[in-house]
From Swiss-Prot:
Pathway: Quinol/quinone metabolism; menaquinone biosynthesis; menaquinol from 1,4-dihydroxy-2-naphthoate: step 2/2. One of its GO terms (biological process) is methylation. Belongs to the class I-like SAM-binding methyltransferase superfamily. MenG/UbiE family. HAMAP family: MenG_UbiE_methyltr (MF_01813). GO terms for molecular function: demethylmenaquinone methyltransferase activity. It comes from Staphylococcus aureus (strain MRSA252). This is Demethylmenaquinone methyltransferase. It catalyses: a 2-demethylmenaquinol + S-adenosyl-L-methionine = a menaquinol + S-adenosyl-L-homocysteine + H(+). Its EC number is 2.1.1.163. It holds the Pfam family Ubie_methyltran. The gene is menG. Methyltransferase required for the conversion of demethylmenaquinol (DMKH2) to menaquinol (MKH2). InterPro entries: SAM-dependent_MTases_sf (IPR029063), UbiE/COQ5_MeTrFase (IPR004033), UbiE/COQ5_MeTrFase_CS (IPR023576). PROSITE patterns: SAM_MT_UBIE, UBIE_1, UBIE_2.
Amino acid sequence: MADNKANKEQVHRVFQNISKKYDRLNNIISFEQHKVWRKRVMKDMGVRKGMKALDVCCGTGDWTIALSKAVGSTGEVTGIDFSENMLEVGKEKTASMENVKLVHGDAMELPFEDNSFDYVTIGFGLRNVPDYLVALKEMNRVLKPGGMVVCLETSQPTLPVFKQMYALYFKFVMPIFGKLFAKSKEEYEWLQQSTFNFPGKEELKRMFEEADFINVRVRSFTGGVAAMHLGYKEKDNTKGD
């Protein structure tokens, strides 16, 4: 528990400090591929108008904005993040969107009732949560029966060429970007370590299943440097018609 608390405090400091530069940093580190990946994921999701969505670890709101457009004026999107500064940037970006609400909170203790949302997403945020499984179980709890959960995250490439390129990128290139944008060694080291240490796609799929998601499928992007995990909460078949 002490390690988790220290971890959470460190992550909070990092994102409080890089909030104003986060979008630019994300574009540079991913070579803007995160936008391409998210568009593909949104296509796979097939979000319907009028639905309620929750974007966990919403950060500055990029996925929240995409969901807002997808659910339309009759739908609702809630974004939640534990960094107040990241949320401030997100509020500026979503100021004109009447169907968006951004709230401050913890992914491991979501402040929502059970069975509240049709979709729950988390993009490039799960790796920053101290306990992945706890967060996934919370996402399951607030998802409606039959609802969809989607995670878009960095992953560990399996193809030999991409594995070598990935290792070289994290050893030599990412530290340079980190030093340019981060204020301290702690910040850029965290960005590097959290990504490199994140579970591979098969291990994460097992976690989804352990969190009681069903029909979990995985889709890799760009040689496996990122992956989508999409699953569902089991429908409640105990109720009659």
